[in-house]
Amino acid sequence: MRILGLDLGSKTLGVALSDEMGWTAQGIETIKIDEAGGDYGLNRLAELTKDYVIDKIVLGFPKNMNGTVGPRGEASQKFAEVLEETFQVPVVLWDERLSTMAAERMLISADVSRQKRKKVIDKMAAVMILQGYLDSLNS
């Protein structure tokens, strides 16, 4: 069983993948997307779901700090529907509050340059989202 973890932004889509046992998440890549133009990287996601035989997708679900759903959360809900229809696998919306900030702090503490952080931040956020989900299953 492999699970794909996604962190949806307006310009990029961070992608992570679980190991076959469902214990750990590894960053795969960051896909450039154009949310305004309706390009969500579905062609590349189709390749990944086929290559890795994905059973489930965990999509980061950004909520406001008070628990309400804002515009980014609504975009994630719509994207989840598209993913389910396109790939015919269950999509789990996972609370991702502060995941990007936590990934940023982790990269800063590892002394990763600002230029390098910009390239990997969404992939790292996807790892944190997926790992949180996997940990909840295995606890």
Curated annotation (Swiss-Prot):
Origin: domain of life: Bacteria
Protein source organism: Bacillus licheniformis (strain ATCC 14580 / DSM 13 / JCM 2505 / CCUG 7422 / NBRC 12200 / NCIMB 9375 / NCTC 10341 / NRRL NRS-1264 / Gibson 46)
Family: Belongs to the YqgF nuclease family.
Location (main, coarse): cytoplasm
Entries under InterPro entries matching the protein: RNaseH-like_sf, YqgF, YqgF/RNaseH-like_dom, YqgF/RNaseH-like_dom_sf
UniProt xrefs under HAMAP family: Nuclease_YqgF (MF_00651)
UniProt KW keywords: Cytoplasm, Hydrolase, Nuclease, Ribosome biogenesis
Gene Ontology cellular component annotations, sorted alphabetically: cytosol
Name this polypeptide is given: Putative pre-16S rRNA nuclease
Gene Ontology molecular function: nuclease activity
Gene3D superfamilies tied to this protein: YqgF/RNase H-like domain
E.C. no: 3.1.-.-
Subcellular locations according to the entry: Cytoplasm
Purpose: Could be a nuclease involved in processing of the 5'-end of pre-16S rRNA.
Coiled coil ranges: none
Major enzyme class: hydrolase
CDD domains: YqgF
Keyword Methyltransferase listed: no
GO biological process, one term: rRNA 5'-end processing
UniProt xrefs under PANTHER family: POLYNUCLEOTIDYL TRANSFERASE, RIBONUCLEASE H-LIKE SUPERFAMILY PROTEIN
